[in-house]
Structures are given as structure tokens and as C-alpha cells.
């Protein structure tokens, strides 16, 4: 990260490659359209490259990068004037008891904000602290919403 901040283009490319899967998954959660995702990713990478010197704490690079992406996604949604529905999961979701279609259906019982939190926590493996920074929420609020979402999902699964 320090190398990228000092202008090392290859170091910057390595940082983006290390985070490409999380970037794509997060963009998919918000946009669900390949062209919009490509636009958001391109704008995010460009913005990150142009502003990496402003990153104060290198340990928060991923959170900072994801915040830029989420803002880009929100801008695209605003421009298109439509709401993002999260009725699909990113690839690679595995569960012994539920298949992908069942997971998709199961998450529909949650409100949009709770779905985002669950997906970021379980599928993108963000910590509560990182999610709170990404979604600009208090970490206690994220923990509470995550706990309530788990309880609701368990209740629905038991039916």
C-alpha cells in the first residue's frame, strides 16, 4: 500500500487484483447489471488511483476502496433512478443444507439493509467494524441487525 501511495503502478495493480473478487461481489449486490458493474469498477479504480495519496491509514485500504465503490454504485443507481434489489447471491455460496436457489429465496425475507449486512459479513468476509465503515453505521447497529437477521433466518429455516 505504501508503495502504491508512492506512485508504484505495479503495486497499485497488485492491490486491485487482491481485492477484485470483493469489488465485483459488492458491485453485484448493488447493481446486478454487468454494464453498470463494469462502469462502477472502472470509476472506482480510477478514483482510487487518483486519490490513493489521501489514504491516511494503509490498514484501512480495503474499507476505503469499498467505500469508493459503494458510492459509485449509489451514483449509478441514482442516475438510473431505480432501487437495487438483492435477490441474488454472488457466486461461490456453499451450504450443506441449502442450495443457491434456496439461499436466494431465504434472503428475500430480510429487508435490503439486513441482506447487505449478511452478504458482506458471510460472503465477503468483512468484519462488523468494516461493514459499519462501509455502510456508515454504528458498529453496534450492524451487530444488532446481523443478530436479528440470523434469528429471522433460523426461524424461517426451521419452518
Language model features: what each stretch is:
Residues 5-14, 24-43, 134, 139, ...:
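Short, charged helix-capping/linker segments at alpha-helix termini
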Residues 50-56, 67-86, 148:
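Arg/Lys-rich amphipathic alpha helix in sigma70-family domain 2
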Residues 117-121:
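A short pre-motif secondary-structure segment
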Residues 20, 24, 45, 111, ...:
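C-terminal flanking helix
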Residues 5, 32, 43-60, 80-81:
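Sigma70-family region 2
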Residues 70, 74, 123, 129, ...:
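DNA-recognition helix of helix-turn-helix
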Residues 75, 79-108, 127:
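Internal acidic/polar
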Residues 25, 39-46, 50, 59-71:
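Structural recognition of an alpha-helix C-terminal capping motif at a helix-to-coil junction
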Amino acid at each position: 500500500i505504501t508503495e502504491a501511495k508512492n506512485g508504484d503502478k505495479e503495486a497499485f495493480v497488485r492491490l486491485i487484483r487482491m481485492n477484485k473478487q470483493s469489488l465485483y461481489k459488492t458491485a453485484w449486490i448493488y447493481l446486478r447489471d454487468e454494464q453498470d458493474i463494469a462502469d462502477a469498477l472502472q470509476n472506482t479504480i480510477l478514483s482510487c488511483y487518483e486519490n490513493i495519496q489521501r489514504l491516511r491509514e494503509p490498514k484501512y485500504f480495503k474499507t476505503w476502496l469499498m467505500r469508493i465503490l459503494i458510492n459509485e454504485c449509489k451514483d449509478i443507481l441514482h442516475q438510473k433512478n431505480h432501487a437495487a434489489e438483492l435477490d441474488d447471491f454472488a457466486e461461490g455460496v456453499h451450504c450443506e443444507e441449502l442450495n443457491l436457489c434456496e439461499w436466494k429465496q431465504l434472503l428475500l425475507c430480510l429487508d435490503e439493509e439486513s441482506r447487505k449486512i449478511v452478504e458482506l459479513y458471510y460472503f465477503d468476509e468483512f468484519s462488523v467494524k468494516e461493514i459499519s465503515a462501509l455502510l456508515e453505521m454504528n458498529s453496534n447497529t450492524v451487530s444488532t441487525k446481523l443478530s436479528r437477521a440470523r434469528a429471522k433466518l433460523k426461524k424461517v429455516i426451521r419452518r
